[in-house]
């Protein structure tokens, strides 16, 4: 992973570790901004700008099918890619009903055959 390191005066930061690829560059950049400029980052003005750039910022995509689909569609449109497939979530599996306990049969002797 990549670690963001910031000096105490918040005048310089560095990334340590593997070089970030495209899939991690945006989250790491946001993390650098958050650590370097914590007061500004949490201000309504910055939050508004961040959400304008990354509308799903601060929201979990896992388990949120509608938001995930929206992010996929928006990304594909912005990058002029083929629209991604619609996420089809299977219907909730029916809960298993408990079966009555089986009556134990007489145990038959088991023979262990060593070869």
From Swiss-Prot:
Specify residue ranges for compositional bias: Basic and acidic residues. Answer: 102-115
Bias (Low complexity): 90-101
Cofactor annotation: FAD
Give the metabolic or biological pathway. Carbohydrate metabolism; tricarboxylic acid cycle; oxaloacetate from (S)-malate (quinone route): step 1/1
Keyword Oxidoreductase, does the record have it?
A: yes
Record keywords, A-Z:
FAD, Flavoprotein, Oxidoreductase, Tricarboxylic acid cycle
What protein is this chain from? Answer: Probable malate:quinone oxidoreductase
Q: Which species is this UniProt entry from?
A: Klebsiella pneumoniae
